[in-house]
Regions:
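Membrane-embedded multi-pass helical conduit in multi-pass membrane proteins
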Residues: 21-50, 76, 341-426, 442-499, ...
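Short, acidic, metal-binding catalytic loop of nucleotide-sugar glycosyltransferases
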Residues: 103-115
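A conserved acidic beta->alpha catalytic loop
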Residues: 121-129, 146
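The conserved acidic donor/metal-binding loop of glycosyltransferases
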Residues: 170-174
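Cell-envelope/extracellular polymer assembly enzymes that use nucleotide-activated donors
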Residues: 83-87, 117, 270
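N-terminal membrane-anchoring/stem segments of glycan-assembly enzymes
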Residues: 1-80, 133, 345, 468-497, ...
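Structured alpha-helical
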Residues: 440-653
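Long helical/loop segments within the catalytic core of UDP-sugar-dependent glycosyltransferases
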Residues: 142-165, 177-265, 276-277, 298-340
Length: 653
């Protein structure tokens, strides 16, 4: 059987059995006779299951249609490429962060580079930002007294520019050189009313889930599931979202909807929604063409998610997206699911507390027998788990979805509720992405998870105590439920305990040819040892010497060619970039492939610095793109305990 047909049949079976299960739950299991509280709690549990399942149904339907809307990039002659305005939005980000993004934009490939107009859009009117723009030869658009956050900044830029296409980048998002060449042609197909092309959000540093849980080699970035999977699937209903950066937009379409919208803290999401209502296609492509920074503190991550939650709800209410006839039924369903997604965190809390209420306090939330429950629930649950795997190309599974929801749930329930009843947040606060050394622990955020963990453990002990034989069998569903929740809570505790960050800049695995010469030397005519990098960063480099090099200086088989503290010069040469660096050896070590030399580096000139940054960032990042399929809960828990006791985490003394 073809993989797509097999997947679709599993989806159909999952929808069928889940529908039967939900019908049974609604009409046959609510404890109406056990009192008002238990009946209300039972209804909440059923509603939580319905919300979660409907979200899955929408994703399954979109996945079954997704292949129909993966568009081929049109082949367009170079002379047809139009002018493009590149907007880089900044508010208060440091100049060294902006430097990397602006620098990368100056290297963007285009048939006629005179048609690419780059602007640093600064709503802080900072002198350092203006000087940076002048230094790198790009335009500067300052805005004082901005009352409309990012929308106001971009609308000001729109008023001072005129190109038919606009590319937008956040301050930390570094585009690859081919970004425009792989997005602009979509707008040049006369048969397609293209309004916006969104490329995936990608990140070159570890996100907090990867970092705090010591999983940087085992799981992809948490946002990959939406950017690379969900948003692409929503091409099927023309509901792909603008995520604020790494995007190209048609100016005339923006002007038709009145520019970037006000009255929401997620102007990007509402922009794409308004474009869709006006009949334009918003397309989410699949190739990563830019990368930026994930949030580096729990507080900033939570603040970011609260803003997303409130903004999506605001925008859906502002545009009447769920009920408007200006969108197709499939689009309205997608926005209903987008709205309900933010309620899934309340659902997660209900799923955690429901077995606790039963096992610890004796409150019955489901009225049924054991075998009846098993007959209706088990097929639905198993097919649900299998379907999650087929929804994603191994980017997300049911376990990691539960872990992420458990970590975020306590902090999103109240903002989602308040926003839904009309208590709005209008103030925009820029997400802090500054990399810091030191611990990432946030013990005050640990309190809700600590309480839930204690309640779940107490429930497990009380409910299983003194049971054996068939009594344990009849209790197995509740015990499974408690253990399942316990897993997510243990991960949440580890997450909040944090981990010590020892580096200010990210190391990116890369194999790039280098030429090295020990001691002082002139740049011209450098002739020395050849090597290949292992990894690169803004402050350092690790490399191996090529085989067959002259190593007479070695006194024994595995002794280093260069000694610690020795200074030398490195030339790095790629197909597109060339940089010369002063280097100082920090250490060397032996592994199974030979000796690795690690050195701190400093570019010689401004041109070397600009090229060195491109050598580092103009590539696909080296962090995982898929889950490690063999990784288990036992592996993760064991690793977290071992590394924290070893001194890698917050337990270090």
């Amino acid at each position: 059987m073809e993989p797509d047909k097999k997947r679709n049949r599993i989806f159909v079976l999952a929808i069928f059995f889940s529908s039967i299960y939900l019908i049974w739950r609604v009409f046959g299991t609510i404890p109406w006779t056990d009192g008002v509280f238990q009946a209300a709690a039972g209804i909440l549990l059923v509603l939580a299951e319905i919300i979660t399942t409907l979200g899955m149904f929408e994703l399954m339907i979109s996945r079954m249609k997704a292949k129909k809307v993966i568009r081929d990039l049109p082949d367009v002659p170079g002379e047809q490429f139009p002018d493009v305005d590149v907007f880089i939005a900044t508010h208060n980000e440091p100049a060294e962060l902006l430097y990397k993004t602006v620098n990368a934009c100056t290297f963007l490939e285009y048939p006629d580079k005179g048609k690419v107009h780059i602007y640093l859009c600064d709503d802080g009117c900072r002198r350092e930002a203006e000087e940076l723009a002048q230094r790198l030869g790009v335009g500067y658009l300052g805005l004082s007294d901005n009352r409309h956050a990012k929308s106001g900044n971009y609308n000001n830029a729109l008023a001072h520019t005129s190109s038919p296409l606009i590319a937008t980048f956040d301050a930390d998002m570094i585009p690859r050189r081919e970004f425009l060449m792989k997005t602009v042609p979509y707008f040049l197909d006369p048969e397609v009313k293209m309004g916006l092309v969104q490329t995936p959000q990608s990140f070159y540093n570890q996100d907090l889930f990867q970092f705090n849980l010591f999983s940087e080699k085992d799981i992809p970035n948490e946002q990959d599931f939406f950017s690379r999977e969900v948003n692409v699937m929503r091409n099927a209903s023309n509901s792909a979202a603008y995520t604020g950066s790494n995007t190209v937009i048609l100016r005339s379409a923006l002007e038709e909807i009145g520019g970037f919208p006000y009255g929401t803290v997620t102007e990007d999401f509402e922009t794409s929604l308004r474009l869709q209502k006006s009949g334009y296609i918003t397309y989410a492509s699949t190739e990563v063409l830019a990368a930026g920074l994930s949030t580096t503190t729990v507080e900033s991550m939570i603040r970011q998610r609260v803003r997303w939650a409130r903004g999506v709800i605001q925008s859906i209410q502002n545009t009447n997206a769920i009920f408007t006839r200006e969108l197709p039924a499939s689009g309205r369903l997608a926005y209903l699911n987008a709205y309900l997604y933010w309620w899934s965190f309340l659902c997660r809390m209900i799923f955690i507390l429901s077995p606790v209420l039963f096992a610890l306090f004796g409150f019955r939330l489901v009225e049924c027998g054991f075998w009846e429950l098993l007959a209706f629930w088990l097929p639905s649950h198993l097919l649900y788990g299998i379907s999650v795997r087929y929804l994603s190309t191994n980017v997300r599974n049911m376990r990691w979805s539960q872990i992420i929801d458990t970590i975020l749930a306590p902090y999103l329930i109240l903002p989602v509720f308040l926003e839904s009843i009309g208590i709005h947040q209008h103030r925009f606060r820029v997400t802090d992405k500054k990399k810091r050394k030191g611990r990432t622990a946030s013990l005050r955020f640990l309190i809700p998870h600590g309480i839930l963990l204690a309640l779940t453990l107490a429930s497990l002990i009380r409910f299983s105590y003194g049971k054996y034989g068939m009594a344990l069998v009849y209790s197995s569903v509740i015990l499974f439920w408690l253990c399942y929740n316990l897993t997510g809570l243990v991960y949440a505790v580890f997450f909040m305990l944090g981990r010590e960050a020892k580096r200010k800049s990210e190391r990116i695995r890369a194999e790039v040819p280098v030429r090295i010469r020990a001691g002082k030397t002139e740049t011209a005519g450098m002739k020395g040892k050849k090597g290949t990098t292992v990894d690169v960063s803004e402050e350092g480099i690790a490399f191996r010497l090529s085989g067959g090099e002259n190593v007479e200086a070695e006194e024994e088989e595995h002794s280093p060619v260069f000694k610690g503290g020795e200074k030398f010069r490195i030339r790095v040469l790629t197909e597109h970039y060339r940089a010369e660096l002063d280097a100082e050896l920090a250490y060397s070590k032996q592994d199974e492939k030979g000796r690795i030399y690690a050195a701190s580096v400093m570019p010689l000139t401004e041109a070397d610095k600009r090229n060195w940054l491109q050598i580092i960032h103009d590539r696909e990042h080296s962090l995982p793109r898929e889950l490690d399929p063999w990784r288990t809960v036992y592996d993760d828990v064991r690793q977290n305990i071992f590394l924290r006791r070893k001194g890698e985490g917050v337990w270090k003394r």
